[in-house]
């Protein structure tokens, strides 16, 4: 069932048909980690951002989270536009992670073609500033395109998409706040 996001008049909440997708949330199984993401589990089609400074463990935490999901039967992937698959595989080996799919890709359309083909339940994109498109866009237009494309495709494919953002060493956010305000 498609989730309706258009405006409507008032209706009693008890009269609204709840899409079955809301009953397909899934958790990592680690209480503290699940609490970081709201405690209710990941809703297929949702998107989220994770922003932190360099060297704070974003990649480590998210790869370990994907491994937990793999162990529970979910199909996951970590896509880096910055690190080679050898670097990602080395990180996975160091962490004892064996089941997570890894790729080095930067073109957003290619990434989501692969997401669709592989039927991933969750994909992490590392990182927003390194993503590109087949369109000839730059700056704010590129950010708007990426933001809309990611959130639309996540919902269409019912795949949870996590996007890594960066803070500078001084603690300021790198980039606009467009994407953090667009995700679920």
Model-based region annotation:
Residues 2-98, 111-117:
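The Walker A/P-loop phosphate-binding site
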Residues 75, 119-122, 156-163:
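Loop/turn-to-beta-strand initiation segments
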Residues 100-105, 132-144:
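Flexible beta-alpha connector loops of hexameric P-loop NTPases
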Residues 126-128, 166:
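Walker B catalytic acidic pair
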Residues 131-132, 170:
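Catalytic P-loop NTPase motifs of RecA-like helicase/translocase cores
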Residues 144, 148-184:
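Phosphate-binding/switch region of NTP-binding enzymes
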């Amino acid at each position: 069932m498609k989730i309706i996001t258009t405006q409507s008049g008032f209706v009693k909440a008890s009269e609204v048909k709840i899409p079955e997708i809301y009953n397909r949330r899934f958790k990592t199984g680690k209480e503290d980690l699940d609490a970081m993401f709201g405690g209710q589990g990941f809703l297929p089609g949702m998107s989220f951002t994770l922003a932190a400074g360099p060297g704070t463990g974003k990649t480590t935490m998210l790869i370990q989270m994907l491994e937990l999901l793999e162990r529970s039967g979910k199909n996951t992937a970590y896509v880096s536009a910055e690190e080679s698959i050898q670097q990602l595989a080395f990180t996975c080996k160091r962490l004892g992670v064996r089941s997570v799919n890894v790729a080095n890709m930067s073109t957003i359309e290619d990434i989501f073609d692969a997401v669709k083909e592989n039927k991933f339940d969750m994909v992490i994109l590392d990182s927003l500033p390194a993503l590109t498109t087949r369109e000839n866009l730059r700056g704010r237009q590129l950010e708007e395109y990426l933001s809309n494309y990611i959130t639309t495709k996540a919902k269409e494919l019912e795949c949870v998409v996590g996007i890594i953002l960066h803070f500078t060493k001084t603690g300021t956010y790198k980039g606009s706040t467009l994407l953090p305000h667009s995700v679920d």
